[in-house]
Structure formats: structure tokens, C-alpha cells
Amino acid sequence: MKVVSSSKARLGVVAALAISALITIQIVPASAGGVDFRKAVAGSGKGITIGLIGLDDSIGFGKDVHDSIEREAKKAGAKFVFCDGKLKGDVALACAKTFKLKKVQGYLNFNADAAASAAICKAGPQVPVIAIDIEQDPCQSAFMGADNANAGASTGKAIGNYFKKNFNCEYDAFISLEDYGVGIANELRMGGYRDGFASVCGAIPAAKLKKYDAGRLDKALEVMPDALTTLPGKNKIIVVAINDQGIQGAFSAAKAVGREKDIWAGSQGAEKTVWCDIKTNDHWLGATAYFPERYGEIGVPYLIDLIKGKKVPFQLKIKHVAINGTNIDKNFKVTGC
């Protein structure tokens, strides 16, 4: 994820590998580490109240995370308090204050505004906190979510492999749809794209690199028409985004001006909303799965452990799976394409 957000603070959430209807590409795993999913143990949360500051339930990734955490909290027998952060730091701050009033004993924080994290920590109850996908200093007891640098590098390398095999590493531009509001997650993930690509095709010349603070659907729709206008007649345009929505916007914008075949894209997330795109669009070079529908199988059991005073690893990173046209049906039930 995940990363999607407001102009000041947006998440991202998930990293891509190559998929093509014509060839098979050698890919590398998005993450060599990570923790296993753990389903909540019945009764383990009895008498405990846990909370979640959500990303934004209007976003598929955020809603999937919310639903999975609520599901596992119910299995554990814990009382669950949800407050939607709606991509805004001030809203997440109000959520933290609500948690204090409701005597939440531990919470998961998917606040999208990294700059607001200190204020949120201060306003909320002084209890164990697990950050989701975005650092929540200084009160996070653990960080759960993407292995951002490796996920980005995996995507970049896969795109590099594709361009090396098909175009001898020749390309017209490398457009990076980023999300500055999410802080270090953006730097790691988007920098990872560039590092991975450079490991195959060499460093990206400054003249070819075009970075935009446009990691969500609406922002990508805004910037891509102008970006394509600066590249008349070019048909080897690489576009990477901090999440799936950015690439959805990129393809929609390109299609509107008859240039959807001029861009070659990679995203992060492999959300359900893009499964058919990954499977059928040979210019969408793939995505690494973050499994937001299973985040609760990490967040809830480890948060309960923290509340009970048990030691928990600080890094609770997802074991990503590289999704492409040849394996998507093995990992997801893709229908209706």
C-alpha cells in the first residue's frame, strides 16, 4: 500500500514485477524477509480494547486493511474501536483523542500524514502502537507493512529486464508518480524503483527522470496529460507509481489522448481493483502484492502481544509476492475480466 493520500499526506501502498502477454521475465522476490501471517487465537483478546486509525475507507486498500483488522479482532474476542483518518492529519489527531477517551489499550495507526505523527502520539493514549505502512514516530512500538526499499527495487529491476530484452534498455522517459506526504516510505519505495532499474539499464539520466507529487488517481489524471505533451511521438515511456491508483490514472489519462500504448507501467499493491489490468494489459508490467486483506493477521495478534507485555519484533514486514500474468491466477481468484 498501499500508498495513497491528500496533497499533503497520502499513502501509498504496493511494487511491481514484469508481466507481458508475449514474454516471460526473470523476476526477483520483493522481500527476502518478513513475518508470517498469524490468525488471531480465539479468546486471546478477551477484556482488551484495541483501536485502528484507518487510512481512508473510500480507498480499496484502506478498506481491506480495516476489514481484516476488524475481522481478526472479533476472532480474538477483543473490543474494536475504529476511527477513519480520511487521509488527513487533523482527522487522525481527533481519532487519537477519541481513543484516549475510550480507554483504548493499544492501537494500529494508518495515519497518512507523517508530519502529524508526533502530535498524534502526544494526543492519544500512552499505549502500544503499531504503525501501518507509514512511520508514526515517536510512539510506534512496531512497524507493520511494506518492505518498501526491496519492493521498489524489485519492480525497477523487473522493468529494467523487460526493457533490456525488448528495447536494449532504450527508453524515452522515466516518470515517477510519488507521494511526498508519506515521508520516508516514498523515498524508499520510489528510490527503490530507480535503483532496481539502474542495476540493469544503468543510471537514469536527469533529463529523462520526471518526478511528480501525484501518487493517487486524481493527481495522476491531472499531471499525465501535460507530461505526455512534453514527449511528443515517444512510445517508450516508463511510468511507475507508489500504488496501483497512480497507474490507473496514468493509463486513463494516456487513453484519453490516444497514447495508452506509449507507456509501460509498474505499480505497488496488486489490489483487487487492478487484477484484470495486470492480467490483460501487457503494458501494465505487474505489481507486487501487499495482501491488505490479511494485514489483520499480523497487526492484531502482535498488538495483543504488546498489550500483554510480550516482546515483539520492531519490523513486522509483509512477505510480498510478485504478481504477473503467469502467476496471478495462482494467487488470486481473478474473474470477470
Describe the predicted segments one by one:
Residues 31-49, 177-178, 185, 197, ...:
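Hinge/cleft segment of the Venus flytrap/periplasmic-binding protein
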Residues 115-150, 169-170, 174-177, 271-280, ...:
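Flexible loop/hinge segments that line or gate small-molecule binding clefts
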Residues 1-49, 124-127, 337:
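Short, low-complexity disordered leader/linker segments with a strong preference
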